[in-house]
């Protein structure tokens, strides 16, 4: 299990892991490379292709643990890491199943116009970094909810619903990372996990979608689900936004569906 875009493992993933563990499942939760307690440079850079390789390494690690059956390993991802998991699963024959929630499935659908408009600037930034310049950083979240509501925010996760997540993190004392490298956008702009959905079969997929998601395109998520072959299962969490499925009442509905999927898969 890894968190989503710019996320850290302590941001509610422990709640999912605890419920899985209570049901008898061993769980590995880790920060993506360059984030939190994980090593790697550059710091605060999202690179989906490298994160795919890290899932393969995570499988290698857990499959060697004495209490893990390597024939019963499931990849789990959320938001950006959901997309990472979908693409990783498409090419990894070793795993037994896939759970994704509110997955990022298409850069073209999600950030295509923005990335195209910024392409020249981003490639100049890439060249400057390779030449020894310091990396430019971009804000992940708006500074205020008023900024988000205005529609003028230049933050990457600029929807007002992000403040549901921010406020809950602050309430629980969970750390937030508020900046990513500008070159993150170059890494993300070619990421198209929906192109590989058909390759995941025959591994079972559970896709959990938040009905009112404004951060990750719900239309793209549902389209990607249609691309996937059986066996597959779709869970739509009604009246929930992108971040509400991490905690509270919507979390309970979400985790119930995930545990039922695992029970059907292994028991």
Can you describe what each PLM-predicted range is?
Residues 19-40:
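Conserved alpha/beta-hydrolase
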Residues 5-18, 32, 219:
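The serine-hydrolase catalytic nucleophile loop
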Residues 86-168:
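Alpha/beta-hydrolase-fold enzymes
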Residues 8-9, 35-74, 249-254:
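Catalytic nucleophile-loop/oxyanion-hole region of alpha/beta-hydrolase
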Residues 214-220:
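Conserved alpha/beta-hydrolase "acid-adjacent" motif
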Residues 238-267:
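Catalytic active-site module of serine/aspartate enzymes centered on a nucleophile-bearing elbow/loop
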């Amino acid at each position: 299990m890894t968190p989503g875009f710019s996320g850290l493992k302590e941001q509610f993933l422990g709640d999912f892991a605890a419920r899985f563990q209570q049901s008898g499942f061993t769980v590995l939760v880790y920060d993506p490379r360059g984030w939190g307690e994980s090593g790697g440079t550059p710091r605060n850079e999202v690179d989906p292709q490298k994160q795919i390789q890290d899932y393969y390494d995570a499988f290698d690690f857990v499959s060697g643990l004495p209490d893990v059956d390597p024939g019963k390993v499931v990849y789990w991802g959320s938001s950006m890491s959901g997309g990472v998991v979908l693409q990783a699963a498409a090419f990894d024959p070793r795993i037994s199943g896939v759970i994704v929630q509110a997955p990022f499935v298409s850069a073209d659908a999600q950030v295509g116009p923005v990335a195209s408009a910024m392409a020249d600037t981003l490639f100049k930034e890439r060249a400057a970094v390779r030449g020894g310049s310091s990396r430019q950083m971009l804000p992940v979240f708006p500074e205020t909810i008023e900024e988000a509501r205005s529609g003028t925010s230049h933050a990457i996760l600029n929807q007002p619903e992000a403040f549901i997540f921010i406020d809950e993190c602050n309430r629980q004392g969970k750390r937030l990372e508020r900046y990513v490298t500008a070159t993150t956008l170059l890494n993300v702009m070619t990421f198209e996990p929906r192109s590989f959905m058909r390759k995941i079969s025959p591994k079972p997929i559970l896709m959990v979608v938040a009905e009112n998601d404004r951060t990750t395109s719900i239309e793209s998520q549902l389209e990607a689900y249609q691309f996937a072959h059986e066996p597959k299962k779709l869970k739509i969490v009604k009246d929930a936004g992108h971040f509400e499925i991490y905690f509270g009442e919507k979390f309970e509905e979400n985790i119930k569906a995930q545990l039922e999927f695992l029970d059907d898969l292994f028991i």
